């Protein structure tokens, strides 16, 4: 089970279509299940809104149904109240094998990501600049990585979805596992630059696995980006030198 809150002006822009707001609000919540090696079964939605146009709610409901159909899940309940636009989504699911937690990383494990980072950041930038690009959909309609979660359930020792930025989310694994991490910048699949590591909204997965499985895991299309080390903290090296970041990732209270 997981719960996510999406708020206007924070998690989505007021200019977005109601269908996209519904889709994004649900799929970003579903992604937490993928990050636990699980698949979704049903959800509930609580909507706070002061929008008066009936057509907005019709389109929002259409977006909900579209999302339910795509992921073969049921809506089992919810609530509506008046106030600033705010959507709370509770998601429930079951593990593909067993739950993959954030506290299972072991010293010497390899660190992987399931796909390229930074596309949603580029998409948001393009949307704000009224530029139509192939990356807009990465922000408007993020895809939870359930198929990849199923595949990595065979070997992952820990896992998390990259919602707040790789540096922050991998940092959570390190803290809960009482280990550190060392990453090779050149091996991380990013779209633009180092800011792709801290922006978030990627909804790819970051996971750890025993290093003797490196070749097998890479052959499945996953990206080896570093290793778990004993020294606490997270180190990113580029050309042998450490990279520092202005911030580690998304902060909901900023």
Q: Where are the regions a protein language model picked out?
A:
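Small-aliphatic-rich amphipathic alpha-helix that forms the alpha element of a beta-alpha
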Residues: 18-42, 59-70, 147, 151, ...
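Glycine-/charge-enriched secondary-structure boundary and capping motifs
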Residues: 51-74, 81-85, 92, 154-254
């Amino acid at each position: 089970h997981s719960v996510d809150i999406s708020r206007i002006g924070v998690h989505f822009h007021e200019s977005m279509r109601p269908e996209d707001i519904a889709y994004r609000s649900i799929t970003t919540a579903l992604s937490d299940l993928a990050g636990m090696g699980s698949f979704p079964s049903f959800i509930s939605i609580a909507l706070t809104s002061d929008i008066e146009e009936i057509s907005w709610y019709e389109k929002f409901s259409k977006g909900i149904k579209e999302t339910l159909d795509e992921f073969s899940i049921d809506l089992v309940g919810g609530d509506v109240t008046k106030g600033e636009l705010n959507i709370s989504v509770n998601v429930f699911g079951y593990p593909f094998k067993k739950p993959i937690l954030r506290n299972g990383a072991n010293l010497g494990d390899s660190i992987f990501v399931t796909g390229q980072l930074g596309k949603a950041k580029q998409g948001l930038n393009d949307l704000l600049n009224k530029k139509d690009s192939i990356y807009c959909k990465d922000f408007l309609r993020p895809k939870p990585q359930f198929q990849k979660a199923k595949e990595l359930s065979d070997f992952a020792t820990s896992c998390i979805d990259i919602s707040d930025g790789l540096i922050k989310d991998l940092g959570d694994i390190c803290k809960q596992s009482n280990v550190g991490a060392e990453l090779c910048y050149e091996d991380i699949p990013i779209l633009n630059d180092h800011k792709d590591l801290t922006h978030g909204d990627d909804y790819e997965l970051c996971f750890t696995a025993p290093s003797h499985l490196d070749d097998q895991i890479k052959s499945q299309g996953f990206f080896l980006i570093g290793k778990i080390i004993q020294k606490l903290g997270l180190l990113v090296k580029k050309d042998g030198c450490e990279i520092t970041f202005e911030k580690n990732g998304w902060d909901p209270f900023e």
